[in-house]
Amino acid sequence: MNKVFKNSWALFLGMGAIMLAYGYQNALLGVRAVIEEFSLASTGFMMSGYFVGYFIGARTIPSVISGVGHIRVFAAFASIASLAILVHSIFVNPLTWFLLRVITGYSMVSIFTIAESWLNDLSLIHI
């Protein structure tokens, strides 16, 4: 058990930080939408973009991972997700935010998929 924890603590810590940061971003986008006086319909539309990207990513990410590799895909989509979050402050438009949320959803599902596959690889080694 100690060996498994010793080999996987960084993965859990990193994923915890990513999930915490995404949770803050998700909550603060709703607050920012109210401050910018978006309508309720446009706020709902904008926030639903995450799930559109998540659905598309869940269907396509396995082929991307098998084509390029886990580490490259993780690094690329972690960078893309952080860039999309930063661009929200530059463009204050519900349609732009919807597209950025699609990108964020696609990136997050790829990060989650890769972390899960790394965890599965670690558990298979130590069984």
Where are these regions (language model features)?
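Intracellular juxtamembrane helix-capping segments at the cytosolic ends
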Residues: 110-123
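Helix-loop boundary and gating motifs at the non-cytosolic
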Residues: 5-51
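Paired small-residue
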Residues: 95-103
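Conserved small/polar residues in nucleotide/adenosyl-binding loops
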Residues: 125-127
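Structural signature of the two symmetry-related core transmembrane helices
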Residues: 72-86
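Helix-to-loop junctions at the C-terminal end of transmembrane segments
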Residues: 57-69
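Small-residue-rich segments within alpha-helical transmembrane domains of MFS-like 12-TM solute carriers
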Residues: 19, 23, 105-113
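Helix-breaking motifs and short loop linkers at transmembrane-helix boundaries and internal kinks
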Residues: 90-92
